[in-house]
Amino acid sequence: MGQDERVHTVDHLESLCARAWPALAEVPLGDWSMRAAAGFTGRANSTLTCGDPGIPIPDALKVVEGFAAGHGIKPTAHVVRGSAHEAAIATAGWHVDLDHPGGAESLVMTGPLEKFAEGVAENLDLPGWWELTAGSEVSAAQRHVLGSGGTVCFASLTDDGEVVAAVRGAVVEDVLHVARLAVRPSHRRQGLARKLMGELAGWGLQQGATTCALQVAEHNHPAIRLYEELGCTEHHRYRYWIPAVS
């Protein structure tokens, strides 16, 4: 593990990532956080199960199901691998959602910004940034999740006025949360992702961050390889769990 990997506990880092990626609706259940954002991303439409829900796990999961039904989303629990609640959630009849569109399992990777910072990204709210990171029709949920949460940066690289690479950064406490890194197919294999990450890291350092955090699906091998080359290592993993079909 890298030197910075245990500066943050798993629960604390999960909390920071959640604050950097705020859902439209967030309702506490003890230490847990039930989240909904009209289906935009698994993170913003699942219940973060770190800490004590304050009631027995089976009862807490019933509350989660009710919350999900009330917001028109599939009941989903965001569960850290190897956490204290994982076995109890399984015993309650829930199972890993192997068909989750974003992937059932994700890595949380961290690394020191100073290792790859180069330049400083400009924070520009460009239409092309939204198109590349969220699509041609941007929903209210997308604008809320991407546009809020800590100190946010819409970083991009352009070519003849066209946004060809984009990434979103959000600083919460001393962590720069990185998400939605995208490069147009016509401009890939030119080092743009690495360049943009370096500039975003420089911006993060200016905001007082020292560490980056990335949540990446385990099947996204190109992204994992890039982040490893930048000096990031795996901190922990989480999976999405759903109730058994009755």
Task: Kindly give the residue locations of the regions a language model identified.
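Conserved acetyl-CoA-binding loop-helix of GNAT-fold acetyltransferases
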Residues: I57-E65, V183-P185, R189-G202, Q206, ...
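Conserved GNAT acetyl-CoA-binding A-motif
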Residues: H71-R81, G204-Q215
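N-terminal charged segments
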Residues: M1-H71, E86
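A short, internal acetyl-CoA/4′-phosphopantetheine-binding micro-motif in the GNAT/acyltransferase core
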Residues: L48-G54, L181-R188, A217
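Acyl-donor-binding surface of acyltransferase catalytic domains
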Residues: P53-G128, C153, W241-I242
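Conserved active-site alpha-helix within GNAT-family acetyltransferase domains
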Residues: S83-L98, R194, E218-R237, A244
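Flexible, substrate/cofactor-facing loop regions flanked by secondary structure
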Residues: A117-A182
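A conserved beta-turn-beta hairpin within the catalytic core of GNAT-like acetyltransferases
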Residues: F40-S46, G103-E105, V171-A179, R188
